[in-house]
Every structure is written in C-alpha cells, then in structure tokens.
C-alpha cells in the first residue's frame, strides 16, 4: 500500500505503481522461496554498487531510522499484544 502510494507521488498512475509493487514483491518472494541462499546473500546478489537497489537499501537499512528499528518495534508490539490476548 505504501509503496504504491509513493509510486503515485512520484508521478505513476495507480495501475502502474501497483503493478510495479506486485512484481517487486513477487520477484523477491520467488527468490527467497526458490533459493537455498539466505536473505543476506540474495540481497547482495541483486544489489549493484551505486544502483537503485543500493540507494534504496541505504535508506532502509539505516540503523537510526531504517526498517530495522521499525520492524523491531512492530514485531515487539505484536508479540506483546499476542501475550495479552492469550490471557483473555
């Protein structure tokens, strides 16, 4: 949803943005499902130095405000809520 929204904000139509998002997610999912390599090696294999994936990953993997911090907080919140719900 957010990726589609960003694509639209960059000038793509909804259909173009959503199609790119679907293919990106499908491609990434297929890579990890159909490979014996781990996620780090797969990432390294598709990342060209100075390329578009490299630039996107530099933002997403920033230790101060990147996805690691966001995913950690989200997973911890879900785990906490799961514990709360298991007591009901």
Model-inferred region functions:
Residues 18-88:
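NAD(P)-dependent Rossmann-like dehydrogenase/reductase catalytic/cofactor-binding core
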Residues 1-18:
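Anionic-ligand binding region
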């Amino acid at each position: 949803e957010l990726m589609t929204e960003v694509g639209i904000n960059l000038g793509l139509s909804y259909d173009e943005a959503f199609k790119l998002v679907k293919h990106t997610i499908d491609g990434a999912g297929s890579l990890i499902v159909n490979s014996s390599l781990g996620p780090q090696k797969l990432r390294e294999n598709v990342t060209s130095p100075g390329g578009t994936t490299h630039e996107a990953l530099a933002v997403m993997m920033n230790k101060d405000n990147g996805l690691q911090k966001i995913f950690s907080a989200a997973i911890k919140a879900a785990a906490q809520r799961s514990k709360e719900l298991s007591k009901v």
